[in-house]
């Protein structure tokens, strides 16, 4: 009873004092539009709720210290101070982190080259040894692709399982490697990694990597010229990642690799090369569309119960090694297969039930990591969060976490050592405030690993430009430091999936005819494909990697009624970014988004320094423009009522403590 009286007294005092401590507003346009009495009422409410939230947080605590440190896997290269080779057979030149290729021709023929012999390149220099798998490339040709991670002299020697074949075994060479001289960050800073132990990706040298992906599930159907055009455009727009699956590829891994696959693999190689030459990281799924894993296993020994037989496992390892050999020298991220976490909707696709224990893609993950000496990030493309989340309801998981999102099952890759980020599939509601369950699951329960919104709704298939940019802002300000944008008709080129239906995200309607008419050239010019680039520019100016999501903690932000927001600030709250929207237009077409009245109101920021001096600017996510910079002084309670947005669209507010 005393406790309740204390709270009531505190709240009454807060309300009374709030009238005498309202801040002096700067004279600027963003304060016009809402009647003064409503602004005053909103501000008093904000102070009231903020103070109450602070009190509750002190009593009950928060989840904000519950994030574990990520487990850092041991690197795959070996410490080695090998001696130089006195008289190498060949000498090559290279630049750091750029892929190189060496071909060896066997003087001996094999009945089944893919199966009969393996070749490996041992590359050493600067105290490191890399054991890099080679691949058979048709006829009597074996190739190896490698990248030198540092300047200096590197040496190599081949090792062949047929040691008597001297045309493949004990071949030697020297590589004179100089520093990369080009313009792309991926080669200036090194391949992307999670080994820094952060909730975001970094380059090899520790520089934060901004993940902004463009989706291409039908890379096999895209032409080489298309890929070249798309890459050049996406780089100019600010994209950093090309997300692909091999749908439509002209090779077949289900029953061995033969001469019949050579031309299809050469075509795919050229696309990998173009993506790399444009400085993009290639987040690629392996081998084929996911349902082909069934015939692959059946053709190579079948199942032992619900698990692949030993011979099927051996074949899975062999094709995994082959994929790594062809593509690991490029800047890549491995994503395994379409929605294979946790089971590719097994009940809907008529394959043996996979679960936490027997998903065959868990084997592929381990095999890829075994042969990938560059330790590229690895994940499994997840089903939508209605089926699988990071921890979800936790049923069957090998660890214990707080359940935030009980509607989904947990990832089946949580206990896989090689799995080091979560490729989440999530399309947040465009018409109501998030309840933050998905976001909290990804932030608190991801074992310290990055969790990104790898797949949302595609522009001009299930959403339009508002929804496509909203998903990116929501992801980054919710601690999901990566976003996979996608547009129709590039998300899956020539795919007619769902074109026969009209769709609506609650904001915009996409008609069947709009879907049918969409071309891949159109997708290059969708407004949101530029707008996510503006988002990247803005967030990089704020050191996004220091921003911590505060979710629904009202001690940081109290939204006005029917205002959508995503809020993040740095550790001491001296840098704050808030994405906000709400509209009065009930037609919800193009420039409107919600069926609820929200006006152009915003809310109250909290956890500021009492009577502290701050500046703020509005950022327009539609055109990338900034407002003037304004000043304000926080109340003695450490709050500030923002007032109206400058315009009735989604906007971004950046608040900084004054120097």
Residue ranges and their predicted role:
Residues 72-127, 132-134, 174-181, 563-569:
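Non-catalytic, glycine-rich low-complexity segments
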Residues 100, 142-144, 638-640:
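Short strand-edge motifs at loop-to-beta-strand transitions and within beta-strands
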Residues 130-196:
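Extended acidic/polar, glycine-enriched regions
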């Amino acid at each position: 009873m005393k406790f309740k009286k204390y709270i009531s007294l505190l709240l009454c005092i807060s309300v009374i004092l709030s009238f005498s401590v309202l801040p002096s507003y700067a004279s600027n346009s963003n304060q016009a539009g809402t009647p003064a009495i409503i602004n005053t009422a909103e501000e008093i409410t904000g102070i009231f709720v903020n103070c109450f939230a602070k009190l509750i947080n002190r009593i009950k605590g928060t989840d904000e210290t519950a994030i574990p440190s990520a487990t850092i896997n041991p690197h795959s290269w070996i410490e080695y101070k090998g001696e130089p080779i006195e008289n190498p057979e060949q000498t090559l030149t290279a630049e750091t982190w750029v892929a190189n290729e060496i071909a060896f021709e066997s003087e001996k023929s094999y009945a089944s080259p893919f199966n009969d012999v393996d070749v490996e390149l041992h590359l050493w220099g600067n105290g490191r040894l890399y054991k890099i798998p080679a691949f058979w490339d048709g006829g009597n040709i074996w190739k190896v692709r490698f990248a030198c991670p540092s300047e200096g002299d590197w040496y190599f020697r081949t090792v062949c399982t047929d040691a008597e074949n001297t045309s493949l075994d004990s071949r030697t060479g020297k590589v004179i490697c100089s520093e990369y001289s080009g313009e792309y960050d991926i080669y200036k800073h090194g391949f992307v990694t999670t080994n820094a132990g952060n909730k975001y990706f970094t380059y090899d040298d520790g520089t934060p990597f901004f993940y902004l992906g463009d989706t291409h599930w039908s890379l096999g159907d895209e032409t080489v010229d298309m890929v070249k055009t798309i890459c050049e455009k996406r780089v100019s727009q600010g994209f950093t990642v090309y997300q692909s699956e091999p749908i439509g590829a002209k090779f077949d891994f289900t029953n061995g690799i033969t001469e019949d696959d050579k031309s299809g693999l050469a075509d795919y190689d050229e696309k990998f090369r173009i993506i790399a030459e444009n400085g993009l990281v290639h987040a690629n799924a392996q081998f084929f569309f996911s349902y082909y894993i069934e015939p692959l296993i059946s053709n190579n020994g079948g199942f032992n119960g619900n698990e692949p037989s030993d011979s099927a496992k051996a074949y899975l390892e062999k094709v995994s090694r082959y994929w790594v050999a062809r593509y690991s020298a490029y800047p890549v991220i491995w994503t395994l297969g379409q929605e294979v976490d946790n089971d590719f909707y097994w009940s809907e696709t008529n394959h043996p039930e996979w679960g936490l224990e027997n998903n065959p893609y868990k084997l592929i993950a381990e095999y890829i990591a075994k042969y990938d000496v560059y330790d590229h990030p690895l994940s499994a493309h997840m089903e939508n969060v209605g089926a699988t989340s990071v921890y979800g309801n936790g049923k069957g998981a090998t660890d214990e976490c707080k359940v935030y999102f009980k509607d989904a099952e947990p990832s089946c890759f949580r206990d896989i050592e090689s799995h080091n980020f979560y490729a989440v599939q999530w399309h947040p509601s465009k018409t109501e405030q998030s309840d933050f369950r998905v976001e909290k699951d990804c932030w608190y329960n991801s074992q310290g690993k990055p969790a990104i919104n790898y797949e949302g709704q595609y522009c001009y298939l299930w959403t339009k430009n508002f929804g496509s940019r909203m998903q990116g802002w929501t992801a980054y300000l919710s601690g999901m430091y990566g976003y996979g944008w996608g547009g129709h008709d590039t998300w899956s080129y020539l795919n007619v999936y769902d074109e026969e239906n009209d769709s609506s995200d609650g904001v915009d309607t996409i008609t069947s005819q709009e879907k049918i008419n969409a071309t891949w050239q159109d997708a290059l010019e969708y407004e949101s494909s530029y707008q996510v680039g503006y988002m990247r520019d803005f967030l990089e100016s704020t050191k996004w990697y220091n921003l911590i999501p505060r979710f629904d903690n009202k001690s940081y932000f109290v939204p006005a009624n029917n205002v959508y927001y995503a809020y993040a600030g740095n550790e001491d709250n001296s840098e704050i970014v808030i994405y906000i929207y709400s509209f009065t237009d009930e037609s919800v077409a193009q420039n409107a988004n919600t069926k609820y009245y929200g006006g152009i109101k915003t809310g109250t920021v909290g956890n500021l320094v009492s009577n502290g001096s701050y500046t703020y600017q509005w950022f327009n996510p539609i055109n990338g423009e900034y407002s003037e910079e304004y000043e304000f002084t926080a109340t003695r309670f450490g709050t500030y009522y923002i007032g109206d947005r400058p315009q009735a669209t989604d906007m971004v507010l950046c608040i900084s403590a004054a120097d």
